[in-house]
Amino acid sequence: MSFAREASRAIRSSFVLWVIAAVIYPFFMIAVGQIVFPHQANGSLVRDSRGQVLGSTLIGQPFTSDRYFNSRPSTTVYSTANPNKDDNLVLQTGISGASNLAPSNPQLIERIKDEDLNRLQTSGIQPTADLVYTSGSSLDPHITPEAARAQVSRIAKVRQLPPQQLETLITQNTDSRFLGIFGEPGVNVLQLNLALDELKPT
């Protein structure tokens, strides 16, 4: 075979593969996602009754009010920033990631003692691991059921709700292990707090 014929065959093969891999396959996956999993494919957004986006079940938010179940600490403040002073362009690019400090690192210990422990103790909360340590991405939307239950007394007092009602709410909003064996049970903080707002004081 001549060089020209071999080169032509290689070019045609590359073009066909490019069309399949860069055009057909991506559009096929987009179509499948929009038809079969439209909610997940569009970011698992949570909206209120007016259609206003409140957040995503996949990305955590910095809940810190005593009226709500608090989120895990985040080294990136859940990729939020002041729109008027966003020097790091967080709102344009988004950031994630933990501090990568070892459990014995003095800087981490100081942060936990000075910030998280003081805040939790002031609120009368027994600290759990996920209430003082960040997740690997610093964007985790979940806390453990134990971390949620540790906050029941504070929220019950502030909202004048019976603790047992909050315990039931936590149980109702706890995600079990995937397929019953993978991962650990978790509570999505955004969904839990939205359900909390629907409760009425007794």
From Swiss-Prot:
Keyword entries, A-Z: ATP-binding, Cell inner membrane, Cell membrane, Ion transport, Membrane, Nucleotide-binding, Potassium, Potassium transport, Transmembrane, Transmembrane helix, Transport
InterPro entries: KdpC
Subcellular location per the Swiss-Prot or TrEMBL entry: Cell inner membrane
Keyword Oxidoreductase: no
Chief localization: membrane
Membrane-related topology note: Single-pass membrane protein
Molecular function (Gene Ontology), one example: P-type potassium transmembrane transporter activity
GO terms under cellular component: plasma membrane
Transmembrane segments: 17-37
Domain of life: Bacteria
Record function comment: Part of the high-affinity ATP-driven potassium transport (or Kdp) system, which catalyzes the hydrolysis of ATP coupled with the electrogenic transport of potassium into the cytoplasm. This subunit acts as a catalytic chaperone that increases the ATP-binding affinity of the ATP-hydrolyzing subunit KdpB by the formation of a transient KdpB/KdpC/ATP ternary complex.
Similarity annotation: Belongs to the KdpC family.
PANTHER family reported in the protein's UniProt record: POTASSIUM-TRANSPORTING ATPASE C CHAIN, POTASSIUM-TRANSPORTING ATPASE KDPC SUBUNIT
Family annotation (NCBIfam families): kdpC (TIGR00681), PRK00315.1 (NF001454), PRK14003.1 (NF010607)
Subunit structure: The system is composed of three essential subunits: KdpA, KdpB and KdpC.
Designated name of the protein: Potassium-transporting ATPase KdpC subunit 1
